[in-house]
């Protein structure tokens, strides 16, 4: 599967470079396209040219790239255009070992496959407390029972209210609400001024402290916490106090936009509005794979096939922009006038 995806990616990327007839082609591009086009034409009865000049020739090359991407993804999109019929025999061209793949394409595919077969710490995009079901007002003292109470202020901040002389452990409060956190990087600070339940202003007692695994950590210092070592708080003073914990970032074994290099810009390219035709074609491809058709996913992709699909479709978007094909998609009406922000916004809604 890696070889087929790498060949498809190599061919699609090579097609981006052939639009200017005055430019000498890279020898690697000539070799890749020469063999790939010959195999593709022979198996599908198409007539793709290596140096497309006319609109019909540009269309044919783009259709070949679309066939390559669909074959590599093992997707059939059916009858979606009166001008394009998917050539199912394309997989036979990609399966031949004669078509070379370039180093970068194979490295990209192997990196995706390798990363998705294992786990490693990566920075999480959402806050650690995004899953909290309730929050409280910052700086409002509230201890309905006991001597300490912790609560969440927002997705990144937690606060601990403490009576005079109180102490306790806050591991359960500081740990993220979901996922397998590896390390959490936070700072803590006492709230200098806060208010009691009646609204009167109070000042935190001096000498409040936080220890991690028995070691005192200074307020304002960045603490790297493994979510296991005990985090204890104390208020040895004679007044009530509130401590605030702010998580700067944390790492997890969950997939993120850093799991694979260039994943974030790849997603941006995939979902960019190039034209109504491209918008519809991309949506059809992703729908067949049970992926988000119009807007990027809420959470980073977690499967190899999804990330490979994003990489191939993003490259297909580049080919679309380079070749400027002109064909129709069923149910798509060409806009009147130039594409503007209002038209694009309406397409995403």
Curated annotation (Swiss-Prot):
Biological process according to GO: fusion of virus membrane with host plasma membrane
Electron transport among keywords: no
Domain of life (superkingdom): Viruses
GO cellular component: viral envelope; viral outer capsid
Glycan-modified residues: 45
Main location class: virion
Compartment(s): Virion
InterPro entries noted in UniProt: Capsid_hemagglutn, Orbi_VP7_capsid, Orbi_VP7_capsid_C, Orbi_VP7_capsid_N, Virus_capsid_a-hlx_vir
The keyword DNA-binding is assigned to this record: no
Entry keywords, A to Z: Capsid protein, Glycoprotein, Outer capsid protein, Virion
Gene Ontology MF, one: host cell surface receptor binding
Family: Belongs to the orbivirus VP7 family.
Purpose of the protein: Major structural core protein; binds to structural protein VP3. Constitutes the surface of the AHSV core.
Subunit field text: Homotrimer.
Name assigned to this protein: Core protein VP7
Species whose genome carries this gene: African horse sickness virus 9
Name of the gene encoding the protein in the UniProt record: Segment-7
């Amino acid at each position: 599967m890696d070889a087929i995806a790498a060949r498809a990616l190599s061919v699609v990327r090579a097609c981006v470079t052939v639009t200017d007839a005055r430019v000498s082609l890279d020898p690697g591009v000539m070799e890749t396209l020469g063999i790939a086009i010959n195999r593709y034409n022979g198996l599908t009865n198409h007539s793709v040219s290596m140096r497309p000049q006319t609109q019909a020739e540009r269309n044919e090359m783009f259709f070949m790239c679309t066939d390559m991407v669909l074959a590599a993804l093992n997707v059939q999109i059916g009858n979606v255009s009166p001008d394009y019929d998917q050539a199912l025999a394309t997989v036979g061209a990609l399966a031949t070992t004669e078509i070379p793949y370039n180093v970068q394409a194979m490295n990209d595919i192997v990196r995706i496959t390798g990363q998705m077969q294992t786990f490693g710490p990566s920075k999480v995009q959402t806050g650690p407390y995004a899953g909290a079901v309730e929050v409280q007002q910052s700086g409002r003292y509230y201890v309905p029972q006991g001597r300490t109470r912790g609560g969440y202020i927002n997705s990144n901040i937690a606060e601990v209210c403490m009576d005079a002389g109180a102490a306790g452990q806050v591991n359960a409060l500081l740990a993220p609400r979901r996922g397998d956190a590896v390390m959490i990087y936070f700072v803590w600070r006492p709230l200098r001024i806060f208010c009691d339940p009646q609204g009167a202003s109070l000042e935190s007692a001096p000498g409040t402290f936080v220890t991690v695994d028995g070691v005192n950590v200074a307020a304002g210092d960045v603490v790297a916490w493994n979510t296991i070592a005990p985090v204890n708080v104390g208020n040895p003073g004679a007044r009530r106090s509130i401590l605030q914990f702010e998580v700067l970032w944390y790492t997890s074994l969950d997939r993120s936009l850093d799991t694979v290099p260039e994943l974030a810009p790849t997603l941006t390219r995939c979902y960019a509005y190039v034209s109504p035709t491209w918008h519809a074609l991309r949506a059809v491809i992703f729908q067949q794979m049970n992926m988000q058709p119009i807007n990027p996913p809420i959470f980073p992709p977690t499967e190899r096939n999804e990330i490979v699909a994003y990489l191939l479709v993003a490259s297909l978007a580049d080919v679309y922009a380079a070749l400027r094909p002109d064909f129709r998609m069923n149910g798509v009406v060409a806009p009147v006038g130039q594409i503007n922000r209002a038209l694009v916004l309406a397409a995403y809604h």
